[in-house]
């Protein structure tokens, strides 16, 4: 997708999300990503993996850019236990034993999957072949049966702001994500009475 198309799309999204809170924007953009083609290592509005969808929704909702694994999201950014329902939240699927998924070996207690909360008991489950909105209650028995435990955590906004400022957790983002990041940073809200300023 070229820059002109990305700008046009993001301008339309800006109009739609102007009056929403950060949490509402996060949920909106997760919903917007339903039916994306799953592709490992991607994070754009056409293709994404699980952590990429959360990182992209964070960028578009808050204006802060990170690109990390599901495990890093859990350990560094979504550290608030028992989060408020009006906060940005994510479900994490933690393996109970060492397991190989594709070419990757996940160690016991490592997060192998994540899904951002797009509503009450609704997550964007970004898996092959396409991402889809699912009930977390429906996913729980499936993942419990595969020996995962699930934890819902809230965003630590301070950690996100610090990482965005330092640029330290931006590993291997695709070209589209970098373009979204550039456009979002150009359009940041400057009114201090509003939220931090994404689209």
Label each PLM-derived region with a short phrase.
Residues 7, 15-22, 63-160, 168-171, ...:
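...with weaker cross-activation on analogous glycine-rich loops/strands in unrelated enzymes
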Residues 25-70:
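Secreted/periplasmic proteins that engage bacterial cell-wall peptidoglycan
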Residues 1-37, 146, 155-199:
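Intrinsically disordered, low-complexity
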């Amino acid at each position: 997708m070229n820059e002109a198309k990305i700008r046009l799309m993001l301008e339309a999204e800006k109009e739609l999300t102007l009056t929403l809170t950060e949490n509402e924007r996060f949920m909106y953009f997760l919903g917007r990503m339903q039916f994306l083609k799953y592709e490992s290592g991607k994070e754009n509005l056409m293709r994404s993996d699980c952590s990429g969808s959360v990182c992209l929704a964070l960028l578009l909702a808050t204006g802060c850019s990170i690109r990390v694994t599901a495990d890093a999201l859990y350990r560094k950014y979504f550290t608030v236990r028992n989060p408020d329902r009006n906060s940005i939240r994510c479900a994490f699927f933690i393996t109970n034993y060492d397991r190989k998924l594709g070419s990757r070996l996940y160690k016991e207690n490592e997060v192998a999957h994540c899904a951002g909360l797009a509503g009450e008991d609704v997550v964007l489950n970004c898996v092959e072949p396409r991402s889809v909105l699912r009930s977390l209650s429906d996913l729980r028995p499936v993942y419990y049966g595969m020996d995962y435990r699930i934890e819902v955590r809230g965003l630590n906004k301070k950690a996100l702001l610090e990482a965005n400022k330092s640029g330290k957790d931006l590993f291997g983002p695709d070209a589209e994500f970098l373009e979204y990041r550039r456009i979002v940073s150009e359009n940041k809200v400057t009114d201090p009475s509003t939220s931090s300023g994404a689209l």
